[in-house]
Amino acid sequence: MAEIDPTQLELERQGILLTTVNRFYNWGRRSSIWPMAFGLACCAIEMMAFGLSRYDVARFGAELFRASPRQADLMIVAGTVTKKMAPQVVRLYNQMAEPRYVISMGACATSGGPFRDGYNVLRGIDLLIPVDVYVPGCPPRPEALLHALMTLQEQIDRQKLGRVRWYGSGDKPQTGDFPVPTFGAKGLEIDGKLVDPVGGLPLLSPYTSPSHGEHRSGQIEHPEVVRQFPIMDPEVELENALKARGIAPEIAADDLKRSVVNDA
């Protein structure tokens, strides 16, 4: 065990603490994380419980849920992100001041969850904005979200001012807004280009960890191929196998059943 410098010990007794700029700045940021009051689906109910007195999130300085993105620095994406809602999520993220962080709460926000093969659900919010911490579960318990907050604090403690994207010394800080998609007739579009078609596969790769510069990984999780799903019910026959592309077999079977059900 290293011995404590007697000079430093004497200074601490007099109320003088020696530290670095990075450590002092990170201490201030991690001790005052203000989440945005923003919920999408059932995970938001667990997020509400997370903010109640039972879990005492005030211990970590994150008890002030703000109703405006201008006053928040943490977005908790709690719930299913539909393709119609995705542009609003990106717009809210762009309105948050730097430094800003994102926690993807639950299976739906992370990868689409049980609605992954649905025509209207985004397969992970990290396709559009960078995510700092992922919380698995459907839905995650408040304790899991509390652990995600602690994990985020640990990440903040390891940051250095000279390397984060939103701080620049000489060069311009990289604080540009992320492109806001538009929901068109064929799906999500960015700058007029289709990036996530309705009922199809996403054509853009997710963002890597913000600690690596928030660049896209360059790898598309699902290559653009024609998938032919088997139908679970042998009584259901597909006239065209391509009709089930991008749809789970159960959904395809149910859709076909509805078209042949008799009223009698």
Swiss-Prot record:
Superkingdom of source: Bacteria
InterPro entries in the record: NADH_UbQ_OxRdtase-like_20kDa (IPR006137), NADH_UQ_OxRdtase_20Kd_su (IPR006138)
GO biological process terms, semicolon-separated: aerobic respiration; electron transport coupled proton transport
UniProt lineage: Bacteria, Bacillati, Chloroflexota, Chloroflexia, Chloroflexales
GO terms assigned for molecular function: 4 iron, 4 sulfur cluster binding; iron ion binding; NADH dehydrogenase (ubiquinone) activity; NADH:ubiquinone reductase (non-electrogenic) activity; quinone binding
Cofactors named for this entry: [4Fe-4S] cluster
SUPFAM superfamilies according to UniProt: HydA/Nqo6-like (SSF56770)
Primary localisation category: membrane
Membrane topology: Peripheral membrane protein
Organism whose genome encodes this protein: Chloroflexus aurantiacus (strain ATCC 29366 / DSM 635 / J-10-fl)
Record-linked HAMAP family: NDH1_NuoB
Keywords: 4Fe-4S, Cell membrane, Iron, Iron-sulfur, Membrane, Metal-binding, NAD, Quinone, Translocase, Transport, Ubiquinone
Family the UniProt entry places it in: Belongs to the complex I 20 kDa subunit family.
Signal peptide per UniProt: none
Protein's job: NDH-1 shuttles electrons from NADH, via FMN and iron-sulfur (Fe-S) centers, to quinones in the respiratory chain. The immediate electron acceptor for the enzyme in this species is believed to be ubiquinone. Couples the redox reaction to proton translocation (for every two electrons transferred, four hydrogen ions are translocated across the cytoplasmic membrane), and thus conserves the redox energy in a proton gradient.
SUBUNIT field: NDH-1 is composed of 14 different subunits. Subunits NuoB, C, D, E, F, and G constitute the peripheral sector of the complex.
Binding site for [4Fe-4S] cluster: C42, C43, C108, C138
Name of the protein in its database record: NADH-quinone oxidoreductase subunit B 1
Cofactor comment: Binds 1 [4Fe-4S] cluster.
Catalytic activity, as annotated: a quinone + NADH + 5 H(+)(in) = a quinol + NAD(+) + 4 H(+)(out)
